[in-house]
Amino acid sequence: MDLEIRLDTPGTLSKKIPFCLGLQITSLKITGFLNRQDFDDVLDDICSSMGTYDDDDNYILDLDQSPSLRCLDMGEAIFVDGEELPFFGFHTQLETLILPKGISSIFESGEHDTGFSGSEMLKKLVLPEGIKILDGLHDCPNLKEVKLPESVECIESYTFAGCTSIEKIRIPKNVSYFDGSSFADCHISRFELDSDNPNFKEIDGVIYSKDLSRLIAFPSYYPHANFAIPPTTRIIGCGAFMDSRIDSIEIPESVEEIEEEAFQGSEIKSIAISDSVKKIGKLAFRFCRNLESIKLSGSISKIPEQLFSSCHSLKKIGIPSNIKRIEYTALAWCGGLEEIIFHSGVEEVTPSGPLLIRTSHLKRVVIPDTLKSLPGGAFSYSGNPDVFELDSRNPYFSLRDGILYSKDGTRIISVPNRNRVRFDVPAGVTVISEMVFLDMVNLEEVTLPATLKTIESRAFQGCNSLQSITIPASVTHVDINALWADNLEDVYLGCSIPPTMTGPISQKDWRYRNVRLHVPRESVTDYRNSPGWQCFDITPL
């Protein structure tokens, strides 16, 4: 059913479109005046699809259960209730959406998205003249027709990312901000730029700052396999090459900085970063699935978080001596990585989260004499029990039967090969570092020495074959997350005085309510009143 309505009084749409009627309308044109109440009472309902989420958190649209509306035309209406378009719709089933006049932003403050992001059906979007800020239109794979009004000043990051049917875009003259992620993965072979825009310059379909010192945005479907960055470029901007289909990029000596997400998701196979580059932002090469080799700049001192995460084709990487610090997650999810060489000069691998790799080809990790800090559980996902090669001059670590310890042997740091069924922590160890046994799903039995004092965070998390563990009376500190193993049934603890529980403690922790904690009979009351331990099912030994 097609319907055309004029509203002389804002807030009265519900009187003209009862709920049952609204679900039957296929095309709706509204003229006159709209306010927030009209969106909340009517438009939100008739523009929201019905569906479910699959196991991968993808939204599956159910057209049989969704409203019938496919075209909503508000182009001759005026929104009179502020300048921000209210949030309405959810994974909208609309195919054509024409927004009203009177708005300067389609993104409502306090919301994380718009109701029409992630819409698989939206094909045409008409934005009103007067709109200044664009955001939240990402992941609409069939959106093809969109024209940016001359009034647009800002196109936020990721605004049209994943709108894979957009083939042509023209940046209006008043735009002062956008970046490469704004149109990431759009089917654009070249950007068009209004010649009167005072902020940007277009050369061969690529957008630069007006003075050519910053490369702003590279089209995802650039028609050539190779690209040489111009020698005027000093900064490769945030998300500049995101999701670009290009094999190789030449970086000139003029480039001093590569900002975060600059090459994320691009199809580059190799890259050499010149020594002129002094800073690289986080996530700069994340999801570069074809990246096989990389030469790092000799002028940077830090590798930030997730710099190469999910680079599945990367098999070998050498961290040069000029790098003093590398975030552990810089190499997260690199399942194809076989060899990591830390050259002499590297001092620190900082704990910024686990690598989250369940299967791994990692065969070799070279630890130099200068490395003094590694997070607990580092590189333990390797199936090679002898993955570590330790420089004998290193004064901070020791290696025994392939297991990495502190130099004096009092702290156990990493136990490679997660296929172990049993492990005996040797006498002399006083600290089990964080995540040492993380996700050792086959581990059924572990023995702890009488010298042990501290069990750090997530030490046994994910050890789902572990049903029982005995903690010696020598232990004084246990992290609340240390014993998070789904099938753990019994914890035997011989301490008369409850060890101090560290970490984010709550009075009721669902993870431990069915875990029996066996403690000395005379200490049962103390444990039941002790923060953290009170979450267990406490019973006397």
Q: How would you name each of these model-derived features?
A:
Residues 40-47, 226-228, 239, 422-424, ...:
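Extended Gly/Ser/Thr-rich low-complexity repeat segments
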